[in-house]
Amino acid sequence: MAALAAGLSKQRAAAEGLGSNQNAVKYLGQDFETLRKQCLNSGVLFKDPEFPACPSALGYRDLGPGSPQTQGIVWKRPTELCPNPQFIVGGATRTDIRQGDLGDCWLLAAIASLTLSEKLLYRVVPRDQSFQKNYAGIFHFQFWQYGEWVEVVIDDRLPTKNGQLLFLHSEEGNEFWSALLEKAYAKLNGSYEALTGGSTIEGFEDFTGGISEFYDLRKPPGNLYNIIRKALCAGSLLGCSIDVSSAAEAEATTRQKLVKGHAYSVTGVEEVDFHGRPEKLIRLRNPWGEVEWSGAWSDNAPEWNSIDPQKKEELDKRAEDGEFWMSFLDFLKQFSRLEICNLSLDSLSTEEVHKWNLVLFNGRWTRGSTAGGCQNYPGRVHRGSG
């Protein structure tokens, strides 16, 4: 009876707008505006009691209390790391994201794709934040969780070693939006270590509330290039990776400098005239910001000398650090899976516009019966009754 009443209460609140991006649910009951006002009035910087700067926030095993990896970690605010910290410098871009000592490349790939759309980015990363005006050591971010937007509040104490950020950081040493976003997502998931080894599509969904689909690149549909092109034009988020057969292969580098088990963002496609025939190209980004494809159509590859110089210059300008072009055929040979998070309810697989109908059911997983697994293992086993 209590569960029914709670469900009805939630439905009523949703009908009144609670859980929308404009009126997000307050995670753990923490209200950003109220807490910031209290800190400004008292003159004391915010310290988050729900996600304190202590070993438990780092992790539970490899980053757990007493782990050798956590020795020497000091939590510092950006104001202690540089003289003029900024939330965002010159607009958030995909080059703002550099991976640190945490295996969350999947999350970085999702964040990099998020920066391709300012509208999407500022839905997750509210603009009203600064280290100057109304600074109180408190920041907030929004994530999509179980059918509603949730606002997560954090303080700005970040884990460092030797005066440098330990995890996600920006190329600009005084820019902190990406490091703070990672901390908010870690809080939502329980710890930083909980972010290790996820799936890019999980990040896409949590940042957008979009509908995701998966393509096995060993058996791609014939129109996949057009699907990707249309998805990018529609503002969808795309990621890809190379499957590994064992843990020993994880993050091993191929002869042509691709990293196995590593998440890449898909950031563009282009068709060029190459020796009198059309050549389909695709642009990818490694969240590490380095270690790029060294095969055909890579930086300084001879293929670039056989296309129109103006086109070459145009494509050069579009590629940022850590980004590279490769032929679409090589992409299909080298990569194992493609994940697309659709923000529009239009179908991507045809030129015609089809609308989806969305029906939302709230329920729960039951351990040993209906509980699902990590999205890294999407296989389903139907368990019969009786």
Regions flagged by a language model, labelled:
Residues M1-G386:
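Structured alpha-helical subdomains that flank or immediately precede key functional sites
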